[in-house]
From Swiss-Prot:
Cellular component per GO, a single term: extracellular region
Native source organism of the sequence: Olivierus martensii
The protein, known as: BmKBT-like peptide
Domains: entry comment: Has the structural arrangement of an alpha-helix connected to antiparallel beta-sheets by disulfide bonds (CS-alpha/beta).
Record domain LCN-type CS-alpha/beta: where: 21-81
Location(s), subcellular: Secreted
Maturation-removed propeptide residues: 83
Signal peptide: 1-19
Major place of residence: secreted
Pfam families per record: Toxin_3
């Protein structure tokens, strides 16, 4: 039974179901989450199943080990229109 469970978990990891990613999670308008203090980002990243901090030089939340379904910011798909 343990071998079967191990096989299922290994298979799921290989097909990417249990994989995680890192990046700047975006808001509904496509912009990064603005921050100055770490505790704000820690709460956001925990919501997405990971951990994170405020990347001070960019004033944006960076998250590690968040779920793959979480939309993250990228330069190629940037839809944020800063006001």
């Amino acid at each position: 039974m343990k071998a079967a469970l191990l096989l299922v978990i290994s298979t799921l990891m290989l097909i990417g179901v249990l994989t995680k990613k890192s990046g700047y999670p975006i808001q509904h308008d496509g912009c990064k989450n603005w921050c100055v203090f770490n505790h704000f980002c820690e709460n956001i990243c925990e919501t997405y199943g990971g951990s994170g901090y405020c990347y001070f030089w960019k004033l944006a939340c960076w998250c590690d080990n968040i779920h793959n379904w979480v939309p993250t910011w990228s330069r190629e798909t940037n839809k944020c229109r800063a006001k």
